[in-house]
Regions:
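Phosphate/diphosphate-binding loops
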Residues: 279-323, 410-428, 450-478
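Acidic (Asp/Glu)-rich catalytic clusters
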Residues: 272-276, 306-314, 402-406, 427-436
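Divalent metal-binding segments
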Residues: 26-36, 41, 45-303, 318-320, ...
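Bacterial N-terminal signal peptides
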Residues: 6-18
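Positively charged n-region of N-terminal signal peptides that target proteins for export
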Residues: 1-4
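A short acidic, amphipathic alpha-helical/loop segment
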Residues: 155, 267-272, 392, 396, ...
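His/Asp/Glu-enriched, well-ordered alpha-helical/loop segment
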Residues: 371-381, 388-411, 416, 421, ...
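Signal peptide processing junction and immediate N-terminal pro/mature segment
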Residues: 18-27
Length: 587
C-alpha cells in the first residue's frame, strides 16, 4: 500500500483564503497533526460524522469539515490524507488477560486443526527453553480439534518430556498438565478433588492431566499462577507486554482492562511507563483471591496507588480495582446455574448445575469481600457466567452499595452470560442510582466458543445468551471485551459478533443464539469505545473523538457504518494513534 502520510508546507495566504463555503476563515493556532478527507465516526452524543480532525499536544483541538480543518495547518503541521478511509476512536477491550497471555504460548490459532498440531507447537516452544523450564500455553479448544477430545498428559509427554507443561483451555476454567507437571505439583491417584474443582481421571482413577476449575490451581501453584510473574525474567515479561501492545495497535486498539494483576506484574508496567514505552492504556484489575484476608491485602496495596480516575502517566496506567470469581465457565459446564446444564444441545447433564467458585462455602465470603472493597471505595469486577451466579453478584453489589452509599465505583458483572429478569432489573437500578452494575460482556464467545456454548446452554437458554437488545431497551450500558486468550483479541471480531451472533463451526446451525438479541453496528461500536472507556474510568479522556479528548484514533480500510455487517470481521486497520502519536501504520 502506498504511504498516505505526507507533510504539507503551505503559504499562510493560501490557508487564509480557504474557508468553508468560500468565506475567509481566521487562522487558528497551527496543530501538530491534521487528518483530512476521511469519514470520521466520532461516537459523540449525536454519533456525528466529520471529515477531519486537528490534534495538538496529543489532544483533539478540532473536529469538522475539511475546509475548516485547513485553518489548523501551519508550516510544521503534519497532514494525513485519509483518502476516504474511516477513522474511529481507538477500540477498547474491557476484559482481557493481557499481560498474563503475553507470557504464554498461544494455542488459539485457527491453523491448529488437531492434537498433532498442538504437540508440534508445544515442542517448538519447549525447544527454545532450558530443560526443566515451565511451558505455559492457552487457547486450546477440543471442540476445534479433529479428535474432539481433551488433550491429555500422555499427548504432552510426547512434545516436552523434559519440561513441565500446563496448557489452559480457551475458557480459562480448565487445563491440561503433562506428567512432569503433575509430578512436580504432587498430583497423584490419591490426590482428592479440591473444593470447587475436579481432577479428571481415567477408568483406573489415575489423573489424565485435565484439571478443572480449582483443581487447576494445584498445577498453577507450580507454574507461577494466573496473573503472576510465572517465574519469567523481568525483561522477558516486559518484552512480552510490549509485543502484545504492538499487536493491539495493529488491530486499532488503544486501551485495555487487564485482569488478574498482582504487585509484581504492576511493577513491570510501571517500569515500561517510566521508559515511555506504553502504546496501550492499561486499567489493572487486581486478583482478590478467595478469602477475607486476601481481599484485605489487595485493599492495603491499592491504598498506596492513585485511585481511578486518577492515573499514572496521564491516563496510561490505572490501578483499577479488585477481581473476584463467583463461579466457573460455560465451556466446562461449571457455571453456577438454577437448572441442570445441557450437553450436545438437547441432552441434559443430569445433576450438574455447576457450582460456586472456591467451593460451596464461598458465596457468603464473596459477599463480605464485596462489602469490604466497596467500603474502601474500590471498583469490583466479578466473574459471573451462570444465571444463579449473576443474581448472587448483583444482589451482593446492591447490598454493599446501599449499605455504604457508595456512588460511582462502577462495579461490573464480568461475562454476564445469561442474566435473569431479576438481574437485568437490578443492573438497571444500580446504573441509574449508583453508577454501578455494568456487564462486561464478550460477544466473541458466541463465535469462537459458540458451538461448545450452544451445546452446553441448550436451545432455550441459547436465545437469552448475551441479551444485548434487551439490555439496550432497558437503558443498560455494557462494555465489550475479548477475554483473551479465551478468544482472539481483535475487537473487530467483537463488533461483528455483537451484530451477527454467529458461531465458528455451525455445529448446531449458524445462529443457535438467534438474532432477536442482535444490535446494530452503532451500538456495537459504543460498547467497544465510549461505554468501555467508562469502565476504565476514562470516558472524559477517550472513547469518542471530541475536542479536548486524547487523540486515540483507529483508521480503517472501510466505513464501519456502511459496509454489510458480515464484513466487520474482516476490517483492516491502516493506522493507529495514541495521544496523537502514530503507534502503528500499515505498509
Amino acid at each position: 500500500m502506498r504511504r498516505f502520510i505526507f507533510t504539507l508546507i503551505l503559504l499562510l495566504s493560501t490557508l487564509i483564503g480557504s474557508g468553508s463555503a468560500g468565506q475567509p476563515q481566521a487562522q487558528a493556532p497551527p496543530a501538530d497533526l491534521v487528518l483530512m478527507n476521511g469519514t470520521v465516526i466520532t461516537v459523540d452524543a449525536k454519533d456525528s460524522i466529520a471529515e477531519a480532525l486537528a490534534i495538538s499536544a496529543g489532544r483533539i483541538v478540532f473536529v469538522g469539515r475539511n475546509n475548516d480543518a485547513r485553518r489548523y495547518i501551519g508550516e510544521r503541521t503534519q497532514v494525513i490524507d485519509l483518502r476516504g478511509m474511516c477513522a474511529t476512536p481507538g477500540l477498547i477491550d474491557a476484559h482481557c488477560h493481557f499481560s498474563e497471555s503475553a507470557d504464554q504460548l498461544n494455542l488459539g490459532d485457527p491453523e491448529i486443526k488437531n492434537i498433532a498440531d498442538v504437540i508440534a507447537k508445544v515442542k517448538a516452544w519447549a525447544d527454545r527453553l532450558p530443560a526443566g523450564e515451565w511451558v505455559r500455553g492457552s487457547g486450546w479448544d477440543e471442540g476445534k480439534l479433529a479428535e474432539r477430545r481433551y488433550i491429555t498428559a500422555a499427548d504432552l509427554d510426547k512434545a516436552a518430556p523434559d519440561h513441565p507443561v500446563y496448557l489452559t483451555h480457551t475458557t480459562g476454567h480448565y487445563g491440561v498438565a503433562n506428567s512432569l507437571a503433575l509430578k512436580l505439583s504432587g498430583v497423584t491417584k490419591e490426590t482428592p478433588d479440591p473444593p470447587g474443582g475436579t481432577i479428571d481421571r481415567d477408568k483406573d482413577g489415575n489423573p489424565t492431566g485435565v484439571m478443572k476449575e480449582r483443581a487447576s490451581s494445584l498445577i498453577r501453584a507450580g507454574s507461577g499462577g494466573r496473573g503472576g510473574t510465572t517465574g519469567r525474567p523481568r525483561q522477558s515479561q516486559s518484552d512480552n507486554i510490549l509485543r502484545i501492545m504492538q499487536g493491539f495497535n495493529r488491530e486499532g486498539m488503544t486501551a485495555v482492562k487487564d485482569v488478574s494483576i498482582n504487585p509484581g506484574k504492576f511493577s513491570v508496567y510501571r517500569q515500561l511507563l517510566d521508559e515511555k514505552k506504553f502504546t496501550v492504556r492499561v486499567f489493572t484489575l487486581w486478583s482478590g483471591g478467595s478469602t477475607i484476608e486476601s481481599v484485605q491485602r489487595i485493599i492495603a496495596q491499592l491504598k498506596e496507588l492513585p485511585r481511578p480516575p486518577q492515573s499514572l502517566g496521564d491516563g496510561l496506567l490505572l490501578a483499577g480495582g479488585v477481581k473476584l470469581y463467583i463461579d466457573g465457565s460455560g465451556g466446562a459446564r461449571t457455571g453456577w446455574m438454577y437448572e441442570d446444564w445441557n450437553k450436545d444441545l438437547t441432552g441434559t447433564d443430569e445433576g450438574n448445575k455447576g457450582y460456586p467458585a472456591n467451593g460451596d462455602d464461598y458465596p457468603p465470603i464473596y459477599r463480605q469481600q464485596v462489602r469490604l472493597a466497596t467500603e474502601a471505595g474500590l471498583h469490583v469486577g466479578t466473574h459471573a457466567v451462570g444465571d444463579k451466579a449473576i443474581d448472587w453478584t448483583v444482589d451482593s453489589y446492591r447490598e454493599a452499595i446501599e449499605a455504604t452509599g457508595a456512588h460511582g465505583l462502577r462495579h461490573s458483572i464480568i461475562h454476564a452470560n445469561i442474566p435473569t429478569d431479576h438481574a437485568i432489573e437490578t443492573m438497571a437500578y444500580l446504573q441509574k442510582n449508583y453508577d454501578a452494575g455494568y456487564p462486561e460482556a464478550q460477544a466473541p464467545f458466541m463465535w469462537w466458543i459458540g458451538d461448545t456454548y450452544a451445546g452446553n446452554f441448550g436451545p432455550a437458554r441459547n436465545l437469552r445468551l448475551l441479551p444485548f437488545r434487551t439490555l439496550l431497551e432497558k437503558g443498560i450500558l455494557w462494555a465489550g471485551g475479548s477475554d483473551y486468550s479465551v478468544t482472539p483479541y481483535a475487537a473487530r471480531y467483537g463488533l461483528w459478533a455483537t451484530v451477527e451472533r454467529r458461531t465458528f463451526g455451525a455445529a448446531y446451525g449458524a445462529t443457535p443464539f438467534g438474532t432477536a438479541e442482535s444490535v446494530d453496528i452503532h451500538t456495537a461500536l459504543k460498547s467497544y469505545t465510549i461505554w468501555a472507556a467508562h469502565q476504565l474510568f476514562l470516558e472524559k479522556q477517550i472513547g469518542s473523538l471530541e475536542v479536548g479528548k486524547a487523540a486515540d484514533i483507529a483508521v480503517w480500510d472501510k466505513d464501519l457504518y456502511r459496509i454489510p455487517s458480515a464484513e466487520l470481521k474482516d476490517l483492516k486497520c491502516r493506522m493507529t494513534l495514541i495521544a496523537g502519536k502514530i503507534a502503528y501504520q500499515a505498509r
